[in-house]
Structures are given as C-alpha cells and as structure tokens.
C-alpha cells in the first residue's frame, strides 16, 4: 500500500486544547490571498476562535440596500494567520469545530452580469441583464432554519440552517496575489457546501507560515450557487490547526467522518470536474494500494460529483467517495480523527471572547 498522503511527523494533540482568541476588527479583513502581513499566529495543535464578515462586509442589511450602491468591495476574509513551522511542500489541515451565525439575518441578491444564468463579461448575450434584487432571510438558530420570503409574492418557506464557509485559503505560490473571490489550488472562494463544522480541509502550503485566511459565511447554499450569492451572513468560527510535514497536497481536499472529497477549480466546468476526479482517483490509489486503473474503475462506480459554484472567475467541482468503499482508509495518517478528538475536548462555551452578535 502506498501511504504517500500519510505522515508519521504528527503534532502531539493529546494534551488540553490551547485556544487562540482573535477578536476580528475591520483592519483584519482583506480581499486577497498573499501579499499581506499576518494578523496573528496559530501554532500546529492550537485552536483558533475568531469571527468573519459576510461577502457584503455587513453593508447590505435591508432589501433596499443594493450592493452596487453600498459596497465598494466584495468577499472579505479574516487573516492571514501565520502557522509557525509550515513550509512549502507541507499540508495545512484546518478542522472546523464550529461555524455559527453571528447575526439573526442573512442576505442574498441577484446582480446584473453575475450568476450562472445571465450574460456576463465573458458570456455575451443580446438580452438585458437580470435586475439587481436583494432578499433578506431570517436566521433562527433555535429552530435551525432560515426563512425564504419571495420578493414578488407572499410565498415563504423554511429551509434547514446549514452554516458553512465559502472562502478559505492560503497564500499562493511564487509571491502571487489572488483576489479572494477566485478559487484555485490555494483554496479561495471554493463555495463548497460540504465545508461545514465537523470537516477537515487540507490545503497545500506554498509559503513559509502558510498564511491562511477564512470568511464568506453562508447560512446555507445550494450546490452550484446558481445565482452567484448564498444566504450570506457573518460567522463565529472555531478551527483546529495542524501541519502535515513533508506531505504535499495538489489541490484542496476535505475529509469528513465518512467520506473523502477532492476539489477542482477551473474554467470550463468540465476541467474543474476532471481536476477533482483525477485527484480523488489518485488519492484513492494511494490510500488503498490499488493500481491507478483499478482506482479509476472504483471511483467510477462508487464516487459522487457536485458543483460548488458555477459563477466565479473559476468554477469549482468536488468529487467524493465514502470511506466504506476504501475499507475505512483515512487520509493523512488519521489527521481528521485526531483533530476531531482535540475538538471534542474543548469546553462547551465555544463562543469565548469572540462571541456575541455582530451588528
């Protein structure tokens, strides 16, 4: 068996969790990955508690607040956070312990020239662009729902609350700076609904310290984010951090208790699909010892695929497989389970100093 995505150089996570509290303020927000000094340091094995803004920087609060009029930039992230000891060729592991709405409301919108079903600057059409319309959702954390209210009728419906982060990434390689809205191998605006609490995200380390940032909270999002905007809201986030030394990761990956997920980002959409499928097949072969062609066949029959977004500068696709099809194999020498165990030892008041309700 080829365990090239496993490592014996694991951080000792057996002791009491060490928590780093970082209360987010406006200067902590950035709209890029790379090219920025760290705002704080989080060591491998520590747990970060912080907050994030929504993609509108909190400026869209009512259905009358048009983003084109009240927003100067979009998609801020909190960071970057420096991880000492992380070096190019390593893998950064981020286990999301809690992703909790910081407001009791969220916002969504349609934009002219943005979204999967409208003309854009690269998809030229003769028809008029879609109108700019804003929807406000009530978020009920007690009931675990968000409430949709149609703008052009009295139709309402409650949808399950499913908090996630749309944008998480590290500094790109080669000194490059990428806008936070762009997903790629460094992570970024992945918009993958599976990036919820209880999952571990693996990212390649391109620069010393990794320099990770996170944000773009969604109270829920459908696969594909077809109109381009989820139920956007600020979040309180608790994340456990580790570094897998000497083990590279080609593109973002997610591990849950029951599945492995590879994420591809590209245009056209079929290339994002191919990237995600190739990585999942390669990962499957490494974890099981299967020949690549046998792994290809196994993933063809046991795998699943879904879009993350079909509206950003790069599209995202994810390829997933249940670990039961891999005889229970886990990635990165059990890092997900180790971080999950660490999270379980945290005290129950996960809010800590970063808690409260954002205005």
Description of each model-found segment:
Residues 8-69:
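N-terminal, Lys/Arg-enriched amphipathic/low-complexity engagement segments
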Residues 23-33, 70-78, 178-186:
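Short, structured beta-strand/loop micro-motifs enriched in basic residues and often containing a Trp
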Residues 42, 83-86, 195:
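Short, well-ordered loop/turn sites that connect or cap secondary structure elements
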Residues 50, 91-94, 203:
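A generic structural signal for residues embedded in beta-strands
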Residues 55-66, 99-109, 209-219, 308-310:
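Short, Lys/Arg- and Gly-enriched loop/turn segments at beta-strand edges
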Residues 101-196:
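Intrinsically disordered, low-complexity linker/loop segments enriched in Gly/Pro
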Residues 161-270, 281:
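Conserved mixed alpha/beta catalytic, RNA-binding, or beta-rich assembly cores of soluble enzyme
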């Amino acid at each position: 068996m080829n365990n090239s995505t496993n490592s014996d150089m694991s951080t000792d996570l057996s002791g009491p969790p060490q928590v780093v509290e970082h209360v987010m303020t406006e200067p902590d927000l950035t709209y890029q990955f790379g090219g920025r000094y760290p705002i704080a340091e989080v060591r491998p094995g520590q747990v970060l508690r912080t907050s994030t803004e929504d993609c509108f920087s909190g400026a869209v609060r009512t259905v009358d607040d048009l983003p084109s009029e009240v927003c100067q930039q979009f998609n801020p992230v909190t960071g970057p956070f420096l991880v000492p000891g992380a070096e190019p060729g390593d893998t950064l592991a981020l286990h999301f312990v809690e992703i909790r709405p910081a407001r009791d409301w969220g916002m969504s919108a349609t934009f002219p020239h943005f979204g999967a079903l409208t003309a854009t600057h690269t998809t030229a059409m003769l028809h008029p662009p879609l109108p700019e319309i804003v929807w406000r959702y009530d978020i009920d954390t007690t009931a675990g729902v968000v409430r949709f209210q149609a703008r052009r009728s009295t139709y309402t419906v409650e949808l399950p609350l499913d908090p996630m982060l749309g944008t998480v990434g590290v500094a790109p390689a080669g000194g490059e700076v990428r806008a936070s809205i762009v997903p790629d191998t460094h992570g970024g605006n992945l918009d993958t609904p599976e990036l919820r609490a209880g999952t571990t995200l693996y990212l390649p380390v391109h620069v010393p310290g990794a320099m990770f940032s996170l944000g773009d909270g969604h109270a829920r999002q459908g696969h594909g984010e077809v109109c381009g905007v989820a139920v956007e809201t600020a979040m309180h986030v608790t994340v456990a951090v580790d570094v897998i030394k000497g083990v590279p990761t080609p593109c973002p990956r997610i591990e849950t208790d029951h599945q492995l997920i590879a994420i591809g980002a590209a245009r056209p959409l079929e290339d994002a699909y191919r990237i995600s499928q190739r990585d999942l097949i390669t990962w499957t072969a490494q974890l099981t010892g299967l020949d690549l062609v046998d792994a290809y066949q196994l993933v063809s029959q046991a795998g699943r695929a879904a879009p993350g977004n079909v509206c950003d500068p790069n599209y995202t696709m994810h390829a997933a497989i249940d670990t039961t099809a891999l005889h229970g194999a886990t990635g990165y020498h059990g890092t997900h389970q180790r971080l999950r165990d660490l999270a379980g030892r945290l005290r129950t008041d996960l809010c800590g100093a970063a808690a409260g309700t954002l205005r």
